[in-house]
Design a protein with these regions (language model features):
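Amphipathic N-proximal alpha-helical interface segments
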Residues: 1-31, 58-108, 234-238
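Short, surface-exposed glycine/acidic/tryptophan-bearing loops
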Residues: 3-8, 13-25, 147-191
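A well-ordered secondary-structure block
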Residues: 21-75, 169-238
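Second-shell loop/turn segments in exported
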Residues: 26-33, 105-115, 129-139, 155-160, ...
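Short, low-complexity, polar/charged sequence segments that are solvent-exposed and flexible
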Residues: 38-41, 97-99, 109-114, 155-156, ...
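Acidic, serine/threonine- and glycine-rich low-complexity intrinsically disordered segments
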Residues: 65, 82-84, 90-102, 110-130, ...
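Short, well-ordered surface patches within globular domains
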Residues: 112-171, 214-218
Length: 238
């Protein structure tokens, strides 16, 4: 993914491609669904699942920013942009066996943390690049600040920009040595991957404004566990 305008991710298991995601290129494996299609077209042409089953547990699908479709060989997740006429903006394809053999819907592997954070940053910069905006540079202090807040939300079991010490995002950024002219914070919890977290935020007006805002630096911090299973914080500043 050196060329961010041709962004895609490929999942490989036992030397075989078992998963694919892209928000810039169409795939012949997407059952005819293409980027730019409208939600009504997808719904009229495909049968949508209303739950996702992992082992013996059913997870109800009640979010409006994506649909899940089952084909003979795969599960296709179609992501929409509610601020751009509900057009398809991302397509994830997971092989049927891979999806159905998953042990759990949430990861508990802390080694995945950095990948989750990196993917989230890549997705943000692709959104910005596509709109002619500057890409955000990785910032270590902002990343540490974001991770600390995600960890605190998990450990103290709350979900808020203001922590239990009554510190705002801006208080925390200053504490981590960030000198800013403008800053913002996004938080998310409960999503099963960096992709789902990204589109949840992009379909929320205030969070979207931050992602596409006038900033230069970003830090993303993710932790797993707790009552929401995953906590994500994004710190932006200039």
């Amino acid at each position: 993914n050196q060329d961010i305008d041709k962004f895609c991710m490929i999942g490989i298991s036992k030397n075989k491609v078992v998963a694919l995601f892209s928000n810039t290129m169409n795939s012949c494996e997407s059952n005819g669904i293409k980027l730019g299609d409208v939600e009504s077209k997808v719904k009229s042409e495909h049968k949508l699942l209303d739950y996702r089953r992992i082992k013996n547990t059913r997870y109800i699908l009640n979010e409006k920013y994506y649909n899940l479709i089952k084909t003979k060989s795969s599960y296709i997740t179609v992501f929409y942009d509610s601020f751009e006429d509900n057009k398809v903006v991302g397509i994830q394809i997971i092989g049927k066996k891979t999806e159905e053999n998953m042990a759990e819907i949430y990861t508990s592997d802390e080694s995945v943390t950095t990948s989750f954070e990196n993917i989230n940053r890549y997705l943000i910069n692709e959104e910005r690049s596509r709109r002619g905006l500057n890409m955000l540079s990785y910032d270590e202090n902002a990343t540490l600040c974001a991770r600390a807040h995600s960890k605190d939300m998990r450990d103290q079991d709350y979900f808020s920009h203001t922590n239990l010490k009554n510190q705002s995002p801006f208080d925390r950024m200053i504490q981590y040595g960030i000198n800013y002219q403008g800053a913002a914070e996004n938080i998310a919890a409960g999503q099963t991957s960096a992709i789902f977290a990204h589109y949840a935020l992009m379909n929320s007006e205030g969070h979207r404004v931050n992602i596409l805002g006038n900033y230069r630096y970003i830090g993303v911090g993710v932790v797993f566990g707790g009552s929401s299973s995953m906590y994500l914080t994004q710190n932006f500043y200039r």
